[in-house]
Amino acid sequence: HTPTRRQRQMCIRDSLYGINVLDYLELYKKNTFVKQESYKLDHIAQVELGKGKLDYSEYGSLHTLYRTNYPLFLEYNVRDVELIEELEDKLGFIELIQSMAYTAKCNYADTFGMVKYWETIIYNFLKEQGIQTPPQKLRGQEKSKQIVGAYVKDPLVGGHNWVVSFDLNSLYPHIIMQYNISPEKMIKGKVDMSVEKLLAGKTKITGDYAVTPNGAQFRKDKQGFLPELMEQFYDERKLWKKKMIEYQIESESCKDPARKKQLNTLIKRAYNNQQVRKIALNSAYGALANQWFAFFSVDLAEAITTSGQLIIQWGEKIINEWLNQVLKTEGKDYVVAIDTDSLYITLDDLVNQVFPEDTPKTKIIDFLNTISEDTIEPVLARGYEQ
């Protein structure tokens, strides 16, 4: 019979166990953050390396090139391989994937998604402690509702001068550590709590449990496995970043070519190791909020997001109270925008009070950098200690 269109499109795919195929196109898309107008090898090579593929346009097609100029056909294919090799030398994405896989003890393919990746991390972590993970009865359960997300403030309308930004470092991992958010530590039953009530000071948390703004409660008697993993990855990342900076400083003053080459290798290795920890830290919440994750829970996910909402809006409250006091204004909103873990603050009124109109911009920028680090950051830190 004549095959249907659907049948003609079907193909057979074989899996060779023990062999992993990594598509550099997928690696590039996953690990770069600037959208390219094209992801063809020729364009990416031009962008990253300043050179592209061999041009065979005079032959019309690869088949014609193959039939009429076989040596050039071979050179064309060799050039493609060399471009991929040079891209890897510069970007190190395969080395990054290898580091991720060895850290989690998983297959290379498992690093492309965070659900399997984090399940493997947790399984091996608990296994080392003699703990068996429970059967995955709820795997693939349907979400009963949309999970509450991060807080994003609508930007204040209009143009704003002298805007500075403050980011809360690794917000979600620190929330997990702060509240001891972990599946085995969550208590059944929720209390009447909300972000709005906590911001307004209409409720007070008492008792032996850590309580998040969504009303979830967590035991504090012992650190949960998820906060412990967050702390481990965070400490390891700090260590690798410190090593990377030390190698970079030494490399800048190094005159010995052999040692400089060795230092470049060490810098790349330290960067990859800290990047692996960063990816793991930033992806933990995403896995936890995924319905296909073995430890998926709406309450756990919302414990993190609502805590993030509370913390970032508390920062907004601290900044506005302080600036209104310093600038002798009343009820003015100086926070022009908020996005998840970032505050964007206009210091235009402060600049106008301190500097005359003709002040060089570089002088104002230096002032804003200094006051941000020496004054505003400590104000935020004291405010969060409440």
Language-model segment annotations:
Residues 60-183, 189, 259-314, 318, ...:
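Common nucleic-acid-contacting/processivity interface regions adjacent to the catalytic cores
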Residues 1-8, 12:
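Single conserved hydrophobic/aromatic residue that forms the stacking wall/gate
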Residues 18-26, 34:
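Catalytic subdomain that performs nucleotidyl-dependent activation
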Residues 31, 36-70, 77:
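C-terminal or mid-to-C-terminal helical accessory/interaction module adjacent to the motor/catalytic core
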Residues 29, 39-50, 158-164, 168-177, ...:
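Feature marking long nucleic-acid-engaging regions of large polymerase/nuclease enzymes
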Residues 168, 178-182, 190-386:
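Conserved catalytic core of nucleic-acid polymerases
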Residues 23, 45, 80, 84, ...:
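A residue-level signal for conserved active-site and pocket-lining positions in enzyme catalytic cores
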Residues 7, 17, 159-161, 332-333:
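Conserved catalytic motifs of the protein kinase core domain
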